[in-house]
């Protein structure tokens, strides 16, 4: 009696699984990645087709292409590199944020701020790094913790602004 019920359940479940797979594969047939790079005050990219986007995730550096597996990633301070369909590469320094890849080859990158390399002065970065290193040695735990965060951001920024 139970084996008949199991067989009936398996038989009923199979078509649903096939339909779900078939629907997902049809949705993911897009050739280009659509990027939205949004800040609270502006959208740098709004549903623009691009070839690839490299993001600084807390899990490591990720290269996102069309048909990438859906994911949500927390971003650390670093460089978002956008390779456009014409082959041109644009880079933006972000202080952190989140990236979401949807099943339909859509990538949303949300950050508080994003800047291009020419927006930074290497001298100012060195000066701020020296000040943050001094503050990291502070006896005040709050000041030291804040300085450690500043150092992480400034280190990533120094590599970007070279």
UniProtKB/Swiss-Prot annotation:
Xref: CDD domains: F1-ATPase_delta
Location of the transit peptide in the chain: 1-24
Pfam families xrefs: ATP-synt_DE_N (PF02823), ATPD_C_fung (PF21334)
GO term, biological process aspect, one: proton motive force-driven ATP synthesis
Ion transport recorded as keyword: yes
Quaternary organization: F-type ATP synthases have 2 components, the catalytic core F(1) and the membrane-embedded component F(0), linked together by a central stalk and a peripheral stalk. The central stalk, also called rotor shaft, is often seen as part of F(1). The peripheral stalk is seen as part of F(0). F(0) contains the membrane channel next to the rotor. F-type ATP synthases form dimers but each monomer functions independently in ATP generation.
Family: Belongs to the ATPase epsilon chain family.
Stored NCBIfam families: ATP_synt_epsi (TIGR01216)
Name of the protein described by the UniProt record: ATP synthase subunit delta, mitochondrial
Organism, as annotated: Yarrowia lipolytica (strain CLIB 122 / E 150)
């Amino acid at each position: 009696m139970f084996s008949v019920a199991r067989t009936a359940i398996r038989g009923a479940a199979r078509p649903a699984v096939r339909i779900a797979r078939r629907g997902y594969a049809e949705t993911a047939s897009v050739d280009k990645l659509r990027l939205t790079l949004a800040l609270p005050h502006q959208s740098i990219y709004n549903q623009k087709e691009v070839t690839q986007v490299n993001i600084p995730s807390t899990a490591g550096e990720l290269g996102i292409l069309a048909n990438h597996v859906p994911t949500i990633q927390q971003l650390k301070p670093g460089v978002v590199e956008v390779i456009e369909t014409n082959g041109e590469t644009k880079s933006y320094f972000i202080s952190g944020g989140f990236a979401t890849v949807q099943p339909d080859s859509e990538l949303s990158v949300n950050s508080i701020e994003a800047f291009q390399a020419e927006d930074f002065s290497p001298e100012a970065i060195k000066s701020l790094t020296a000040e943050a290193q001094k503050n990291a040695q502070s006896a005040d735990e709050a000041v030291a913790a804040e300085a450690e965060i500043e150092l992480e951001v400034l280190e990533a920024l120094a590599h970007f602004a070279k």
